[in-house]
Design a protein with these regions (language model features):
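Eukaryotic nuclear low-complexity, Arg/Ser/Gly/Pro-rich intrinsically disordered regions
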Residues: 2-12
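A detector for short, charged/polar N-terminal pre-domain segments
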Residues: 10-20
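Short, flexible turn/loop "capping" segments at secondary-structure junctions
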Residues: 19-23, 84-88
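Core segments of cupin and vicinal oxygen chelate
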Residues: 21-23, 31-76, 192
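Short coil/loop residues immediately preceding or within conserved phosphate-binding loops
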Residues: 26, 56, 90, 126
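Vicinal oxygen chelate
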Residues: 31-37, 94-150, 158-180, 185-192
Length: 192
Protein backbone atom coordinates (compact mmCIF):
# COMPACT_ATOMS: atom_id res chain seq x y z
CA UNK A 1 0.00 0.00 0.00
CA UNK A 2 1.29 3.44 -0.87
CA UNK A 3 1.99 5.90 1.90
CA UNK A 4 0.49 8.67 -0.22
CA UNK A 5 -2.95 7.31 0.77
CA UNK A 6 -2.17 8.61 4.26
CA UNK A 7 -1.63 12.20 3.12
CA UNK A 8 -3.75 14.59 5.22
CA UNK A 9 -6.77 16.18 3.63
CA UNK A 10 -10.47 16.71 3.99
CA UNK A 11 -12.81 13.94 5.02
CA UNK A 12 -14.64 12.62 1.94
CA UNK A 13 -18.43 12.74 2.01
CA UNK A 14 -18.45 9.42 0.16
CA UNK A 15 -15.52 7.00 0.13
CA UNK A 16 -15.03 4.77 -2.91
CA UNK A 17 -15.22 1.05 -2.17
CA UNK A 18 -11.59 0.83 -3.31
CA UNK A 19 -10.03 4.31 -3.24
CA UNK A 20 -7.52 5.45 -5.82
CA UNK A 21 -4.05 6.40 -4.58
CA UNK A 22 -4.14 9.98 -3.26
CA UNK A 23 -1.04 10.85 -5.26
CA UNK A 24 -3.01 10.63 -8.53
CA UNK A 25 -3.70 13.97 -10.22
CA UNK A 26 -4.61 15.38 -13.62
CA UNK A 27 -1.46 15.59 -15.74
CA UNK A 28 -2.77 17.57 -18.70
CA UNK A 29 -5.89 18.41 -20.67
CA UNK A 30 -6.05 18.07 -24.46
CA UNK A 31 -8.75 20.07 -26.24
CA UNK A 32 -10.06 20.40 -29.77
CA UNK A 33 -9.75 23.87 -31.28
CA UNK A 34 -11.11 25.57 -34.37
CA UNK A 35 -8.04 27.78 -34.87
CA UNK A 36 -4.54 27.12 -33.48
CA UNK A 37 -3.30 30.68 -34.00
CA UNK A 38 -6.28 32.20 -32.21
CA UNK A 39 -5.88 29.79 -29.29
CA UNK A 40 -2.11 30.48 -29.17
CA UNK A 41 -2.75 34.23 -28.99
CA UNK A 42 -4.91 33.69 -25.91
CA UNK A 43 -2.93 31.08 -23.96
CA UNK A 44 0.59 32.22 -24.92
CA UNK A 45 0.33 35.94 -25.70
CA UNK A 46 -2.20 36.86 -22.98
CA UNK A 47 -1.89 34.24 -20.21
CA UNK A 48 1.84 33.65 -20.74
CA UNK A 49 2.13 29.87 -21.22
CA UNK A 50 5.20 28.63 -23.12
CA UNK A 51 4.94 26.62 -26.35
CA UNK A 52 6.77 23.34 -25.75
CA UNK A 53 5.90 21.56 -29.00
CA UNK A 54 4.10 22.49 -32.20
CA UNK A 55 2.93 20.60 -35.24
CA UNK A 56 0.92 21.97 -38.18
CA UNK A 57 -2.31 20.76 -36.56
CA UNK A 58 -1.45 20.67 -32.84
CA UNK A 59 -0.01 22.90 -30.13
CA UNK A 60 1.29 21.90 -26.69
CA UNK A 61 1.84 24.52 -23.98
CA UNK A 62 3.09 24.45 -20.40
CA UNK A 63 4.28 26.40 -17.41
CA UNK A 64 7.21 25.60 -15.18
CA UNK A 65 9.03 23.21 -17.51
CA UNK A 66 6.33 20.50 -17.57
CA UNK A 67 6.08 18.52 -20.84
CA UNK A 68 2.61 19.99 -21.45
CA UNK A 69 -0.19 21.32 -19.32
CA UNK A 70 -2.59 21.88 -22.21
CA UNK A 71 -2.72 20.44 -25.70
CA UNK A 72 -4.82 21.70 -28.60
CA UNK A 73 -5.49 20.14 -31.98
CA UNK A 74 -7.54 20.71 -35.12
CA UNK A 75 -7.63 17.01 -36.09
CA UNK A 76 -11.45 16.91 -36.02
CA UNK A 77 -12.34 20.53 -35.36
CA UNK A 78 -10.62 22.98 -37.74
CA UNK A 79 -13.04 25.84 -38.36
CA UNK A 80 -15.60 24.16 -36.11
CA UNK A 81 -17.99 25.68 -33.61
CA UNK A 82 -18.36 25.07 -29.88
CA UNK A 83 -20.99 22.54 -28.76
CA UNK A 84 -24.39 24.15 -28.24
CA UNK A 85 -25.65 24.87 -24.72
CA UNK A 86 -27.52 21.99 -23.13
CA UNK A 87 -25.07 19.30 -24.24
CA UNK A 88 -22.74 17.27 -22.08
CA UNK A 89 -19.00 17.78 -22.04
CA UNK A 90 -16.40 19.93 -20.39
CA UNK A 91 -17.71 22.53 -17.94
CA UNK A 92 -14.34 24.10 -17.17
CA UNK A 93 -10.66 23.39 -16.66
CA UNK A 94 -9.06 24.87 -13.56
CA UNK A 95 -5.61 26.39 -13.99
CA UNK A 96 -4.10 26.69 -10.53
CA UNK A 97 -1.66 29.52 -9.85
CA UNK A 98 0.97 29.02 -7.11
CA UNK A 99 0.35 32.31 -5.28
CA UNK A 100 -2.32 34.97 -5.00
CA UNK A 101 0.15 37.39 -6.63
CA UNK A 102 0.46 35.19 -9.73
CA UNK A 103 -3.34 34.99 -9.97
CA UNK A 104 -3.36 38.79 -9.70
CA UNK A 105 -0.89 38.90 -12.59
CA UNK A 106 -3.23 36.73 -14.68
CA UNK A 107 -6.10 39.10 -13.92
CA UNK A 108 -4.02 42.13 -14.94
CA UNK A 109 -3.05 40.38 -18.20
CA UNK A 110 -6.73 39.79 -18.99
CA UNK A 111 -7.65 43.40 -18.17
CA UNK A 112 -4.84 44.74 -20.37
CA UNK A 113 -6.14 42.58 -23.23
CA UNK A 114 -9.77 43.69 -22.61
CA UNK A 115 -10.69 40.02 -22.12
CA UNK A 116 -14.03 39.50 -20.38
CA UNK A 117 -14.62 37.43 -17.26
CA UNK A 118 -17.86 35.53 -16.82
CA UNK A 119 -17.57 35.44 -13.03
CA UNK A 120 -15.38 35.76 -9.95
CA UNK A 121 -15.71 34.02 -6.61
CA UNK A 122 -14.06 33.36 -3.27
CA UNK A 123 -14.94 29.75 -2.47
CA UNK A 124 -13.14 29.74 0.89
CA UNK A 125 -10.77 27.03 -0.33
CA UNK A 126 -9.65 29.11 -3.29
CA UNK A 127 -10.18 32.34 -5.19
CA UNK A 128 -11.40 31.95 -8.76
CA UNK A 129 -11.77 33.89 -11.99
CA UNK A 130 -14.12 32.36 -14.58
CA UNK A 131 -13.96 32.95 -18.32
CA UNK A 132 -14.22 31.20 -21.67
CA UNK A 133 -11.30 30.75 -24.03
CA UNK A 134 -11.72 31.72 -27.72
CA UNK A 135 -13.24 28.28 -28.47
CA UNK A 136 -15.79 28.61 -25.67
CA UNK A 137 -14.04 26.22 -23.28
CA UNK A 138 -14.73 27.18 -19.69
CA UNK A 139 -11.69 28.15 -17.63
CA UNK A 140 -11.25 28.72 -13.93
CA UNK A 141 -8.05 30.57 -13.08
CA UNK A 142 -7.54 30.00 -9.37
CA UNK A 143 -5.27 30.19 -6.35
CA UNK A 144 -5.70 27.71 -3.48
CA UNK A 145 -5.46 28.92 0.07
CA UNK A 146 -3.26 26.79 2.32
CA UNK A 147 -5.18 23.62 3.20
CA UNK A 148 -5.08 24.56 6.89
CA UNK A 149 -7.34 27.54 6.04
CA UNK A 150 -9.99 25.59 4.11
CA UNK A 151 -13.44 25.90 5.70
CA UNK A 152 -14.67 22.61 7.18
CA UNK A 153 -17.87 21.55 8.88
CA UNK A 154 -17.90 19.73 12.24
CA UNK A 155 -17.24 16.36 10.53
CA UNK A 156 -14.22 17.66 8.61
CA UNK A 157 -16.06 17.90 5.27
CA UNK A 158 -15.36 20.83 2.97
CA UNK A 159 -17.72 23.74 3.44
CA UNK A 160 -17.39 25.51 0.10
CA UNK A 161 -18.56 29.06 0.00
CA UNK A 162 -19.56 31.65 -2.55
CA UNK A 163 -18.21 34.84 -1.10
CA UNK A 164 -17.50 38.08 -2.87
CA UNK A 165 -13.96 38.14 -4.24
CA UNK A 166 -11.88 41.21 -3.38
CA UNK A 167 -11.17 41.98 -7.03
CA UNK A 168 -9.40 45.30 -6.37
CA UNK A 169 -7.13 43.63 -3.83
CA UNK A 170 -6.40 40.77 -6.22
CA UNK A 171 -5.59 43.24 -9.02
CA UNK A 172 -3.09 45.03 -6.79
CA UNK A 173 -1.56 41.82 -5.37
CA UNK A 174 1.98 41.56 -6.68
CA UNK A 175 1.61 44.52 -9.05
CA UNK A 176 4.66 46.74 -9.55
CA UNK A 177 4.55 49.50 -6.91
CA UNK A 178 4.39 52.23 -9.56
CA UNK A 179 1.07 50.73 -10.76
CA UNK A 180 -0.63 50.75 -7.32
CA UNK A 181 -2.19 54.00 -6.11
CA UNK A 182 -2.22 55.29 -2.52
CA UNK A 183 -5.53 53.50 -1.86
CA UNK A 184 -3.97 50.18 -2.86
CA UNK A 185 -5.76 49.92 -6.22
CA UNK A 186 -4.08 48.82 -9.43
CA UNK A 187 -3.73 51.54 -12.06
CA UNK A 188 -2.34 50.07 -15.28
CA UNK A 189 0.63 51.91 -16.72
CA UNK A 190 -0.55 50.99 -20.21
CA UNK A 191 -2.91 48.65 -21.98
CA UNK A 192 -1.80 46.20 -24.63
Amino acid sequence: MSTTNQRPGVTPREVAPRSIDRGVDIGHVHLKTADLERIKQFYVDILGFDVVFRMPDALFIAAGGYHHTLGFNTWESKGGTPPPPGTTGLYHVAIRYPTRATLGDALRRLVRADYSLSGVNDHGTHEALYLNDPDGNGLELCWDRPQSEWPLDAEGHLAFGNRRLDLAGLMAEGAPSEEVDSAGHWQPAHRA
